[in-house]
Swiss-Prot record:
Chief place where the protein resides: nucleus
Lineage, opening ranks: Eukaryota, Viridiplantae, Streptophyta, Embryophyta, Tracheophyta
Disulphide bridges, residue numbers: none
Alphabetized PROSITE patterns for the sequence: HOMEOBOX_1, HOMEOBOX_2, START
Function: Probable transcription factor.
Gene: ROC9
Coiled-coil zones: 149-182
Record-annotated DNA-binding residue ranges: 95-154
Protein name stated in the entry: Homeobox-leucine zipper protein ROC9
Amino acid sequence: MGTNRPRPRTKDFFAAPALSLTLAGVFGRKNGPAASGGDGVEEGDEEVQAAGEAAVEISSENAGPGCRQSQSGGGSGEDGGHDDDDGEGSNKKRRRKNYHRHTAEQIRIMEALFKESPHPDERQRQQVSKQLGLSARQVKFWFQNRRTQIKAVQERHENSLLKSELEKLQDEHRAMRELAKKPSRCLNCGVVATSSDAAAAATAADTREQRLRLEKAKLKAEVCMPPPRSRARPFRCATLQDTDSGELAMLNLFQIERLRGTPGKSAADGIASPPCSASAGAMQTNSRSPPLHDHDGGFLRHDDDKPRILELATRALDELVGMCSSGEPVWVRGVETGRDILNYDEYVRLFRRDHGGSGDQMAGWTVEASRECGLVYLDTMHLVHTFMDVDKWKDLFPTMISKAATLEMISNREDDGRDGVLQLMYAELQTLTPMVPTRELYFARYCKKLAAERWAIVDVSFDESETGVHASSAVRCWKNPSGCLIEEQNNGRCKMTWVEHTRCRRCTVAPLYRAVTASGVAFGARRWVAALQLQCERMVFAVATNVPTRDSTGVSTLAGRRSVLKLAHRMTSSLCRTTGGSCDMAWRRAPKGGSGGGGDDDIWLTSRENAGDDPGEPQGLIACAAASTWLPVNPTALLDLLRDESRRPEWDVMLPGKSVQSRVNLAKGKDRTNCVTAYAARPEEEEERGGKWVLQDVCTNPCESTIAYAAIDAAALQPVIAGHDSSGVHLLPCGFISVMPDGLESKPAVITASRRGGEASGAGSLVTVAFQVPASPSAAAATLSPDSVEAVTVLVSSTLRNIRKALGCDSCEEEF
């Protein structure tokens, strides 16, 4: 180690055996010869590896393209001979740097640390250098080179996937161009259409469109003209119940389909009204549909409505900021729950309007107010863009939002910024059970940047008396200024302060869920924040490159992780849309008794059809059944049972008595309970299953947990694990779509378990079990057959019976 050593040359590190890596060495390597060596061996280095020589440490300072490794046993020494500068016996010889080989034990220890922390800090590097007898620079460059090689391998794999996708798109493009060159044919008879026929058809279409526009303008003038005795009464827009089939043809069909939430279906005499939730006899108030508006894509009645809505949103923003930053006496900490409780008298004194909050205290209405704070692992701008995009917002809260739409953009920006954007929206909120009616909301959403790293998103329902907007009597829920403040924190996190303040019309709720809905847990701020934290962790883990091996078994590539997590998210979202009490799902009680009876549990039935619009589900008529019940068990104990691989044969009717083992396990959050798992029968029983696996997605937060699973062919899942697109994989999910505390702290639990930190307490659990089965391969089938009804109800009742038996509470009775 002389002081006059010249600067070394740069070595080609891709040829070094120590850095010939594969993803299996990072994610799935087991203890063995390969693990002890630490790296894969390239073709030209097999003899060196077989001789037991350790890999060479390569760094940015001791590498050169022309260097070769010394074969000296001591692991140190000069590499090759000396190069003479003058060739005439000069005494100045260029001395090459000594290269030190790492022993197998050194590589093993550094690999173990790399799996836990690919980016060690200075303290960790110093500790490793002292432990292994290496310099801190050697440790630093070893980790740097390892990360570089892993990134290169991942990029090559992703590039190959992108290349194959590009070739596929090019083939489709060529096929479409060839098809466009062919002459057009009539869709009805198949005859080639001539240019004269096409011109005549276009002329007829234009004439018909002009006639419809004239009739529409006439009807619009008649509807908007109030009678002489009611000029002071507010305008009520027409709904489907007020319009006959002849007038329906004059309405904006796109607006009807968008607001009603129907998947583009129409009846013979007009637009078909979607079935409404009938999950309880007194829940018929849920049958009201979103109002229809006969403006060309517009929602406002007058041009001067926009300034009034902007003024309303500005006032709501000021109130939201005050509600988020206020302490006592506006918000009082609850003694039993520890959550913030709104002091309504103080709220009216500080914030509320000229009428003193009388609108919130109308007969037949209840007021719910809650506030929650939490840290979210996502940057501020990503959250802001997600909240202002209705599709992304709905996908972010699959357990809470069943339908959502943007009605009209009031204020927008030409660039991609979101500061000052104001839009009118519609949403239908749900609890994951058919026994609780959904909540329909029409509101204005306003996004405003308050400071450099501080944003506010406020929702407020619009009042026709102040804005002139088409407010409908069908709206059953009203948003007082609600929303969230987002403040940027360090390490890519942000602080979320959420306020949920609504008033709803009183409606009959099943006794099972009265405590949950009355306390505000079902639709409160705490549930919104918990769901947001869960989904943000899922998105972060989907793109993370430093996931420990124990949290990513069975999948060796980043693209594979993304594909599997995307498939699991689609499975859970599909089951959430099916199980809620939305107007689109006409739930009815299943007949009790017989082989399909559910015992004392009420089983709800409905059906839906897939005419080929969703490639991720089987086509035809699908029978759906769900049952909600109370179990005298802590939610943690119930969740532990459902996740226990060894106890799954006790309750899973899809694997009756079959022992299973986990083939894939991907964590998607800090809590390893949130994971995606693929189960398969053990090798001695796998032949009986015919290559069927069970894909399961577990999502848990302090407010509720969901467990969605579905049978899937192993041959269909393997390409997804390899990183290919999962949109075409057929899944028909089922599962325990909702496990939440019952809200009755005074009721003693029969079975208890140690709770995780921060989990909601409760004496028992409210559980909703849902199953789906194909009823008919044809979507034209109108009703479910008795065999389909019996099959799906037996699955639900058998699963509940098995769960009670496994928990030892099959003899317990509900006490509500």
